[in-house]
Amino acid sequence: MEYFPFQGSGTDTEELNNIIATGAQAIINNLTLLEREITKFKTSQKREWMIKGELYYEGEHDILTHERKVIGVGGRLVKAENLPNNRILDNQYAKLVDQKVNYQLGKPLTLETENDTYLKLLQKIFNKRFHRTLRNMGLDALNGGIAWLYPYYNEQGEFTFKRFPNSEILPFWKDAEHTILDSAVRMYTESGYEGDKEVLYEKVEVYTSNGVKCYVWFNGRLVEDVEKPPISYLTIEDEDGKEIQLNWQRVPLIPFKFNIKEIPLLKRVKSLQDGINTMLSDFENNMQEDARSTILILHNYDGQNLGEFRRNLAQYGAVKVRSSDGSKGGVESLQIEVNSDNYKAILSLFKKALIENGRGYDAKDERMANNPNQMNIQSMYSDIDLDANGIETEFQASFEELLWFVNMHLANTNQGDYENEEVNVIFNRDILINEMEVVEVLDKSAYLPLETRIAQHPYVSDVQLELKRLKQEQKEQMDQYDNYETTFKEKQGGVDGTTT
């Protein structure tokens, strides 16, 4: 075998990947090293962002734990118990996540392959239940940067799929690009009883190509789970009724990434979302602080140091001053106006910046007024479309891995060998279109194949079904024409041409 000049028998990337793969195998085979990696992962910033992304989507924002503080004596911040402390959140982040997920995965997938039998088998596997799972995978990928799909056989022996929360999975990769999985650890909690007391146990499962090993996480150590011995991914019975343990050639955990860096969406927009919540809360606080709208100045009722001055101003809305001669006493007011327009302007800027940084779209965009043309619509969707292209690239690669398990399942269950069959997975984006313009363009595109035009038609959801209906309609028209021709000939002189 010959190699390119200066390349040798292996590239630097291959050597690096070999080192990474060797290191991953060493960790999995050494419980002490594995315990260290689990401890690091449980407290890592990456996992914290995964958990935080899920919490923010559910509406658990930092503003809900916000404490109102003022400058006290000595310039130190102290908690103010007597001031309004509204904690208002406007969850624009959840809206952005739903927008992106529904845009990318709101519609069912379209599968294309030249083998009709294979297509029917795939459609049976990738059914509506799978579409729901895939959409939830999209939520996981955006909130945590990566999602995990587990293909397995359930208790009824059916081939199906399960999603694992990304904060539960610690992957070990074979390569620096994180494309080939060597093994993985799953950490989760499970309730149980010690006598009459309900307790939570931390469980750990180690997934390799040799099956699954189960442990209990106790005081930072891995203890073998006596209730769950090592298991394989599949158990079958031979002709004699004897159980045979089988495993996949690959680890059955498939990553679906939001982007190549596995960065969650929240990391782009958290400061903007927090800013929106803070502005709304501060505005409500100011509206409720009647005493703060008017500051009382008490003349010649003892002076005060700066720390006491700031505390009294914030908490009581009053300050005491002493004139030089001390002859004048009384009360004077200082009016402060809360300008709501300032809050509106800042909120508008924050929301616009959140949409732009999160690469979404504004459904209230001025370009969508009246009857927008297709160019205006495409312009509004440009940012979310570019981001969707990146997500689709990652998901397409994941589907290649998923199809390997599907093909192995079909082969093992004697449904056919489709390993070399080409499959095109199409993500049907839920985009607003000017239907009239699209239909007009398709009508004028006579040079395109009929199937292509039908696939692009806005009213078509199942291309094969529409083609079947069209063929049936054409057949009925031909039958009507044949019946008409026969009747016409009979009236003219008989079917055989003789005069009647």
Regions found by a protein language model. Name each.
Residues E48, E58, E81, N85, ...:
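Conserved aromatic-histidine-acidic binding/catalytic patches
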Residues M1-F164, E168-F172, A176-T179, F488, ...:
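Extended, helix-rich architectural segments
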Residues E114-Y118, L122-L134, A141, R268, ...:
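Short amphipathic alpha-helical segments
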Residues E308-D325, V338, N342-A345, L349-T500:
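C-terminal helix-loop subdomains that flank or include functional centers
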Residues S232-P372, N376:
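Extended, charged amphipathic alpha-helical segments
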Residues R135-K261:
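Extended, regular secondary-structure scaffolds
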